[in-house]
């Protein structure tokens, strides 16, 4: 095992693809799976939307090393989740660079995730603000023991940002969802926040409708 293997544990993991090749697509969606899940499982979102969204999309779903983007709960001290967290953020950056090289800019790319993947989606966009096609966080929030505003500086340039979560989720404190939405509002994103009564840790049809609308607006 090399030092790079230790510092970048997600390097070399597969990226599953659906839809058009990036070189042939007009827009893209990056899908980030949750803890214990897989790239294949998060691609079920593509299957759910396939017949009702535009067909000129590239869908990319990276696989986390050992099915986990970072080892501890997302509201643990950030250093406990290193180096896995930095490695996971780097994977998102590398996918965006790959899409850009294929002719798909960030403003034509949606970053979407569920659970750990939702947290990662928000954390990447918050640390790297700019105009994206959209950011969709299903059951997630910004990462860290507290929300450190100093990490999130710049402008989201009215990027659509959707946060959806249950009013009681055993993994996601509702307060963190509200705090995360406030950060993105401060950064100038077009924020939609939905708290669903009794939803639990899952995805509902209303969230899929928001996802569909975000994609269609690309």
Model-assigned labels for residue ranges:
Residues 71-77, 140-160:
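Flexible "cap/lid" loop of the alpha/beta hydrolase fold
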Residues 43-47, 148-149, 173-183:
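Short alpha-helix in the alpha/beta-hydrolase fold that links the catalytic acid
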Residues 4-106:
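Serine-hydrolase catalytic machinery in alpha/beta-hydrolase-like enzymes
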Residues 112-117, 121:
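Gly/Ala-rich beta-loop-alpha elbow adjacent to hydrolase catalytic centers
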Residues 162-165, 169:
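Short beta-strand/loop motif that positions the catalytic acidic residue
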Residues 111-113, 138, 164:
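Short beta-strand immediately N-terminal to the catalytic nucleophile in serine-hydrolase-like folds
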Residues 130-143:
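A conserved short beta-strand
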Residues 162, 178-218:
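C-terminal catalytic histidine-bearing segment of alpha/beta-hydrolase fold enzymes
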């Amino acid at each position: 095992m090399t030092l790079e293997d230790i510092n970048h544990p997600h390097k070399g993991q597969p990226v599953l693809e659906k839809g058009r090749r990036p070189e042939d697509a007009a827009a893209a969606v990056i899908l980030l799976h949750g803890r214990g899940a897989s790239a294949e499982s998060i691609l079920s979102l593509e299957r759910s939307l396939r017949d009702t969204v535009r067909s000129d999309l590239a869908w990319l779903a990276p696989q986390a090393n050992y099915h986990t983007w970072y080892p501890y709960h997302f509201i643990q001290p950030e250093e406990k989740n290193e180096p896995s967290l930095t490695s996971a953020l780097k994977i998102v950056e590398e996918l965006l660079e790959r899409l850009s090289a294929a002719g798909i800019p960030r403003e034509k790319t949606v970053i979407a995730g569920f659970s750990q993947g939702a947290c990662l989606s928000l954390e990447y966009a918050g640390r790297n603000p700019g105009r994206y096609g959209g950011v969709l966080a299903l059951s997630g929030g910004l990462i860290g023991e507290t929300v450190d505003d100093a990490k999130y500086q710049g402008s989201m340039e009215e990027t659509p940002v959707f946060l959806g979560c249950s009013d009681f989720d055993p993994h996601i404190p509702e307060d963190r969802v509200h705090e995360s939405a406030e950060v993105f509002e401060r950064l100038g994103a077009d924020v939609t926040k939905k708290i669903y009564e009794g939803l639990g840790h899952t995805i509902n049809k209303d969230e899929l409708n928001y996802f569909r609308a975000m994609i269609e607006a690309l």
